[in-house]
Amino acid sequence: MPRQDDSGRDMTSDHPVGPRAYEKFSYDGFDGEVGRIMSTSTPAWTRPPTAPDGAPNVLVVLVDDLGFSDVGCFGSEIDTPHVDRLAAEGLRYVNFHVNPMCSPTRASLLTGLNHHLAGVGTVCHMEPGFPGYAASIRSDAVTMGEVLRDAGWSSLMVGKWHLCPDSQLTEAGPKDGWPLQTGFDRFYGILDGFTNFHQPHRLYEDNHALDVDDFPDDYYFTDDLTDRALSMVGEICDGHPTKPWFL
């Protein structure tokens, strides 16, 4: 009597490899089937995350030591037309809490957590060895970069990171607290807390330090960051015009 599998397929020995050719195997995380031979296997390709149609680009600007009324839309005597336009076309918040230190503010902004819960209770330099003061974002704290990257956005960052201890500022690592290990596809800027705006002491690109110590007379760090940000966004638009970005 012919032997059949669950789908009714004949598993008698008329197959050149024999009845075991029709056996199927499944693996966790794999939606296809693996048979004894290629003709009895079903492939499955992992699809990259794709943002919804019409998903917006997300631009976040964090400025150190910025007072409440230091921009025009909040009453500054200094003209800030581009920031004012962003405010006019978006939302302005007047009730908020912020830590008056750079590293804790960055950790809270990226994770949505109180800075102690995020692991950054004070400015990141040394790890004092107490809970809430790890000098880097906790590994189980999900960042905005991770959420948007995993939802289909390109995740980019330029500027000052300041979310890893001094012991992680070398090429030797560990690099657990670096931007590319914390949800970002690209990074350009500095990892520590400050630098010279005309001659930065150590610049980083993606996951490595740059060997640059000679800058032109008209070099200005902020202009460099702006140019790099535009370049990153341009590369995304050229390579994948419909993919949104988070910067």
Predicted segments with their positions:
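Formylglycine-dependent sulfatase
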Residues: M1-L247
